[in-house]
């Protein structure tokens, strides 16, 4: 029998319903794995007592044949989802000891469906980063190692702890957040399925904000089916979130294994010009195209001319929104407060924020404040918003001809910890292919599609029309089926 912590969400549910094992046994298997691999630094807060209590309640539900859709399934949550009575830090010193008195909309939805929380996962501070190297709790180490040198690799970011937890079999699934690629890029780096739904599908209530017009909850799983199961539990209207979409929760599981014959899939191959993409990833892109052709899809060459400006636009809009959102951390109402004798209020603000925020967060606050200043708002912020509209128009024009779009999740494979740390613009470019869909608020998924010459996982990204998670899952499922001969599992786990 497969080790319990290696079971998928679907297989775990099947085993629990058939009384093959208990939720408590399932949780204990994950706790054992977490304890074994603490060196990866995937978790910042462990909630084992809560998990075991929830598991016992789940086992009682199964005994009475009254189980819910996620009854007894162990999951982890990125540490920016507020959890009532449980420390929520966004991995920043300014919130290091913050304990919220309310529950986020997404975690509440999962609890309502019977989910069991193992703990809160590490992340880049305030979700600002692409390598999980800006956390106040230290770097996350990927479970994966390259075949050539075995060096420690980044798991991607900002949801690197969640990616490491699921990839390392320390959680069956894990919540992440995706602002410019923070679920899809780590999923690509760690051989996982990483799904970001349409903006507004999942409640942002109780999520620590980075950039409010871009932030969206996402999910890491080890299969496309698991992704559909988790999404059905996460999605739902929340009146406490003004951007929440008031629609019925869609049935997504039927998309898995559904034929893609006749589907039109757009491929913007021109984005691969100029040597930006590593050769292994270009090779995977072309092989995935052939795979989808063999499955009956029609491949159509499309143009997304304004996506080349996506990174520049994102790094104006996101820091601008961050500078506004993070102004609330002033040492007065909650979080860190640094005081000295005879200190003025302005001095308290300055010292508290200087002590509480890390370098990357300070950098983005400064950029955001600059582009919002009266002298530069027209030249930068308003212009960026206009180009954002053009990026969205490119997608609308493409979706008039195609059902989904295929492109790589990231231009590179996972890199060594510290390798790109000295130049932040290099890590910013890792979101080159994920940012455009975020700017347009589209549903998208990264699905493992191959291995590099160094034995590292590579992900392909499927982007769909707004609210069309179903077809995104259809295409992702076809890709998954086409590469089922490849084992996306780190050695030693």
From Swiss-Prot:
Spell out the reaction equation it catalyses.
L-glutamyl-tRNA(Gln) + L-glutamine + ATP + H2O = L-glutaminyl-tRNA(Gln) + L-glutamate + ADP + phosphate + H(+)
What NCBIfam families is this protein classified in? gatA
User: Mind telling me which InterPro entries this protein's record contains?
Assistant: Amidase (IPR000120), Amidase_CS (IPR020556), Amidase_dom (IPR023631), AS_sf (IPR036928), GatA (IPR004412)
Q: Which species expresses this protein natively?
A: Rickettsia bellii (strain RML369-C)
Question: Which Pfam family, any one of them, does this sequence belong to?
Answer: Amidase
Keyword terms:
ATP-binding, Ligase, Nucleotide-binding, Protein biosynthesis
Q: Name one GO biological process term.
A: translation
Listed GO cellular component terms?
Answer: glutamyl-tRNA(Gln) amidotransferase complex
Q: Which family does it belong to?
A: Belongs to the amidase family. GatA subfamily.
Q: Which residues form the active site?
A: 78 (charge relay system), 158 (charge relay system), 182 (acyl-ester intermediate)
- Going by the record, the broad EC class of this enzyme is ligase
- Give the molecular function GO annotations: ATP binding; glutaminyl-tRNA synthase (glutamine-hydrolyzing) activity
Tell me its EC number(s), please: 6.3.5.7
Highest taxon in the source lineage? Bacteria
Q: What does this protein do?
A: Allows the formation of correctly charged Gln-tRNA(Gln) through the transamidation of misacylated Glu-tRNA(Gln) in organisms which lack glutaminyl-tRNA synthetase. The reaction takes place in the presence of glutamine and ATP through an activated gamma-phospho-Glu-tRNA(Gln).
Q: What is the recorded name of this protein?
A: Glutamyl-tRNA(Gln) amidotransferase subunit A
